[in-house]
Amino acid sequence: MKRAVVVFSGGQDSTTCLVQALQQYDEVHCVTFDYGQRHRAEIDVARELALKLGAVAHKVLDVTLLNELAVSSLTRDNIPVPDYQPDAEGIPNTFVPGRNILFLTLTAIYAYQVKAEAIITGVCETDFSGYPDCRDEFVKALHHAVSLGMAKDIRFETPLMWLNKAETWALADYWGQLDLVRRETLTCYNGIKGDGCGQCAACNLRANGLNQYLADKVGVMAVMQQKTGLAQA
């Protein structure tokens, strides 16, 4: 039996990964992390989507210690979430230091216990928003360390790594779930479901990608299929 574990936040990217994983694996588990994030609604959204889409198990892990250590606008109410700034340089204050290091490592422990062959994460270098822990180089390095530490090669799959947001929308549409991803996921840094607040960086990346996809569905879909190797419809 092919078994995978999805690092699942209930946002656009991880939900798209879950939708695809359910088509490619016999059994899919989801792991969501409670790290005292600013908007706890994302945990509820993740629970609802994991159940609705048919994950065989959904584990919510308490890692609130991260909140004490990692100062970010996503972990502190007194640090405002910045509006979208397309020309901004450096690491944004929405970056939570160590988050993906911790999430992937703990998910690997869970995957080891349930005998999963793969961990799937929605990190993306194309639209990585300045987050160093979304880079391909980082994921490969951590995979190497985890494989050594567990003496087991659990694959780290990153299906969105080289897709832009328009192509990520195309991937959701390829699997027939564009409307669900648009209406029922929570990507917004201000905690608003669906199309979100429209002001933060996450909402702007998401909206711009959707508009680009809807403006040229055939072309974007073709590029996505070429990048991912998915069959033409």
Curated annotation (Swiss-Prot):
UniProt cofactor(s): Zn(2+)
Any one Pfam family match given in the protein's UniProt record, by short name: QueC
Gene3D superfamilies to which the protein is assigned, alphabetical: HUPs
UniProt KW keywords: ATP-binding, Ligase, Metal-binding, Nucleotide-binding, Queuosine biosynthesis, Zinc
GO molecular function, one term: ligase activity, forming carbon-nitrogen bonds
UniProt cofactor note: Binds 1 zinc ion per subunit.
Annotated residues for binding of Zn(2+): C188, C197, C200, C203
Domain of life, per lineage: Bacteria
Catalytic reaction list: 7-carboxy-7-deazaguanine + NH4(+) + ATP = 7-cyano-7-deazaguanine + ADP + phosphate + H2O + H(+)
GO biological process, one term: queuosine biosynthetic process
UniProt-listed Enzyme Commission number(s): 6.3.4.20
Family statement: Belongs to the QueC family.
Function: Catalyzes the ATP-dependent conversion of 7-carboxy-7-deazaguanine (CDG) to 7-cyano-7-deazaguanine (preQ(0)).
Xref: NCBIfam families: 7-cyano-7-deazaguanine synthase QueC, PRK11106.1
PANTHER family attached to this UniProt entry: 7-CYANO-7-DEAZAGUANINE SYNTHASE
Name this polypeptide is given: 7-cyano-7-deazaguanine synthase
Origin species: Klebsiella pneumoniae subsp. pneumoniae (strain ATCC 700721 / MGH 78578)
Taxon lineage: Bacteria, Pseudomonadati, Pseudomonadota, Gammaproteobacteria, Enterobacterales
